Amino acid sequence: VLLNFKEYKLPPSIRVEGDDPCKHKTKLQLRKYQEFISAFLDYKSPYKEMLLYHGLGSGKTASTINLMNILYNYTPYWNVFILIKASIRGDWMDEIKTWLSKDEYSKRMENIKFIHYDSPYADKNFLDAIKESDSSKKSMYIFDEVHNFINNVYNNITSQTGKRAYVIYDYIQQEKKDNDDTRILLMTGTPAINNPFEIALMFNLLRPGIFPNSEIKFTEKYIKGNRLDPVNKNMFQRKIIGLVSYYSGADKQLFADKHYHPVTVTMDPYQQEVYEHFEDIEEKIDKKNRNKPKGKAGKIASTYKSFTRQSCNFTFPVMGGKLTGENRPRPSKFQVSESDIQKILEGNNKLDDTNEGNEQFIEYMDVIKLYMKELKIYFDKIDNKDNKNNKSINKDVDVFRHKYNYDFHKFWKEHKDKSELLKSFYSCSCKIVAMIFNSFSSKGPIIMYSTYVKMEGLEVIKLYLHYFGFTPFNKKDGKDYFRYVEYHGSISMEDRTRNKKYFNIPQNIKGKVIKIILISPAGSEGISLMNIKQVHVLEPYWNEVRINQLVGRAVRQCSHADLPMNERYVDIYRYISQRQNKKETTDENIQGLANKKDELIGSFLTILKEIAVDCELFKNHNIENNEYRCFKFNQDSLFEKTIGPAYGYHDTNVLDNGYNSINSQVTKIKVNKVKAVRDLGNNTYSSELEYYMDYKSGVVYDIELEFPIGKVYFDEDGIPHILKKGVYIISEVIPIPELKNKKTN
C-alpha cells in the first residue's frame, strides 16, 4: 500500500491562529482519502470488499459513488444493491444526482436497486430484487449505516425472534463464498453498537468464516475481562488485514467543541419511596421470567427495568384517591402488550400488527391521559397557593441566577425559601428540575432529550416548562426566549419539518424565536440543528452509541459557523438519579453497563484503526497524541522468503507475526538521510534516490513514508557496499509488487 499509493498520503493539517475554516469556500471535488478507496478497490484489485470506517463529515456516500463510477468505467455490467434505512434514501438520491451527469443518470439507475433494511418486508424486497436482476452481471452490495443492519442480524440470532436481517445476511455471505468476484462495501462511523461480536459478524460477511459463528466461542477466544484479549489481538488483526479503511472525519476545526457535564442528582425521599416500590415489583417479575424460553425472554429484554427507569425520571405525586405514584397504570393490568406500550411511550406510534385488545389499549391510554390531566390540576393548586403567599418559581429562578450564579447544587442545598411548587416538582423529579434550571445559563438554543415521549419523558418536561413560562411555538404568540418545539415520532412529518425550519433560522441564533427543541430517538434520525449551545440528556441508555448520535445532531460540520469562534462550543449535560442512601439506582446501573460496553468495544475499534490499509497514509489527520500505532509486520520477517498467509487459521497461530504479537518489541533506531541505488543485477543499478538508513542493520527506508525498502550489505570489515562516494548500494530489495494504471476518478 505504501509503495503503490503514496500519492494519497495526507499532509499535516495547517492551523492558522484566528483563521475560520468554516468561512473557506470549497469546490465540489473528491478528497485524496476518497479517491484512495477507488484506487485500492478498482476493477483489477485483488481486494473486492471493505469496511469503510469513516467518521462524521467525511463524505462516505460520495466515496462510494466514486467507486461505483470507477467500476462502471471498466465495465457497465453490474448489479448494484444499496441497502439503507428508509429515512436516508432521499440523501442518497441527492448525492447520486450530484456525482452523476444528467445524460448518464437514467441509464445508470437501471442497475441500482435500493432495499430498506428497516422495512418489515426487507427480506422479501431483497430477494425480489435479486430475482429481477441480471444474473450474467457481477453483483455489488453496499450497506450504509451497516452497524444498524448488523445489530438487527445479531438480534435475529440471539433472540430467535424475527429473521428479516439474517435472511439478507446469509444470502450475501453464501454468494461471497461461492463467487469471490462479489463485491461488498460496508459504510459506518460506528462499527458496533452493543457487542464486539457485531464486529465479527461484519467481517464474516466480508471474508466468510474467519471468526466463529458462535458468540460464546468468539468471546472465549478474543475477550479477556473487559477488553480484547492481548494474546489474540495480533491474530484478530491478521484475519482482517486488507478489509478496513479508516478516516476520522472532517477537520475537527469545522466542529464546535464538546464540553461534557455529568450531573448526579439525589432523589427526594418521596421519589425514592415510589422508585423502591417498583424495584420490588421488577425483582418479582425477574424471578418469574428466568425460566421462560429464550424467544420470550428476548421480548422481555426490550422492556427490562422499564418501571425503575421511568421512576428515575419522574414519579407521580399523591393526587387523591387511587391516583398515586405507586398506582401509575401498567399495561399488564389492561391486558395490553408491554412492548407495544413501550413504543408508544417512546414516541413511536407504529404498533405491531399483532397488537390485540384494542378496547383495552384505548382504556389504558385514557387512564394515562387522566393521570396527566390530574397532574396539571395538582400543580395548579400548589401554584395558586404560592401566588397568595407571594412565592413563585420565577422568583426561585431569579435567586438561582443572581445569588447562586447558576450553580444548581449549591442553590438547592442552601436556598431555604423555595416555592412550594418547586419543592413539589423536585419531589417528583430531581432530574427534570436540575435540567430546567441548568438550561437558564444557556446563551443559545437548547436540546432537551429523553428516550420517553409520553408520561415520564417529554410530556412531563413540557408540563414543567409551562410553569417556568415556556409555551409551544407558533409565529404569533409567546414570549421571546421562552418558546419550545417538538421533534419526534408522535409529531407529524409536516410539523417536524416546520419546527426544524424555524428552529434553524438565522434569527434564532440566540434562541430568541425558539429556545428549546424537545427530541427523542424515534423519528429524529438525520436531523441537523444549528447553533445549539446546550444538550440535556435526561436519562442514560444501554449503549453510548445512541447518546453519541444525539450529540452528533447538535454538533455538525460548521453548524456553529454563524457564531464567533470563541463561542463555538456545546455544553452536554447527562443526568443520573441517585438514592439518598447511595444504593445503586437503575440510572447508575445502566450508565455503568454502557461505560463497560464502550470500553470493550473501544478496545476492538482501536485495532481496526491500527490495521486499516490506509493507516500510514492518513495518520496526519487521524492520530493525535500517539493514541495508537499502525500495524506492521516484524521487520526481520520482511527479508525472509515468506511471512505466511495473513489470515489462515493455522498460520496465524504458528506465525504470530505483527506489531501486536506478544513476542514483538518496539525499539527506536537512529537513521541518517543517504543517497542509494537498487542493485538490478548484471552490474546495473536504478537511479539515485534519497532514503533513510539505519547504519547498525543496513536497512534502508522510504524517505516519505518510512517503510523498509531493502538492505545495504557490509563486508567483513564492516564497510558498506557503495557505488561511488556517498552513494550506497541496496543489495537486497524487499519484493513489493507494484501496481500499474491505477484509476481514481
PLM feature segments, named:
Residues 543-563:
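Conserved SF2 helicase motif VI
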Residues 1-508, 512-531, 567-661:
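Helicase motor interdomain insertion/brace
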Residues 522, 540, 562:
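Short glycine-rich donor-binding/catalytic loop of glycosyltransferases
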Residues 196-199, 541-547:
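Conserved AAA+/SF3 P-loop NTPase catalytic/coupling segment centered on the Walker-B
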Residues 626-745:
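The feature captures the C-terminal accessory region of ATP-dependent helicases
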Residues 535:
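Short conserved active-site loop signatures built around small residues
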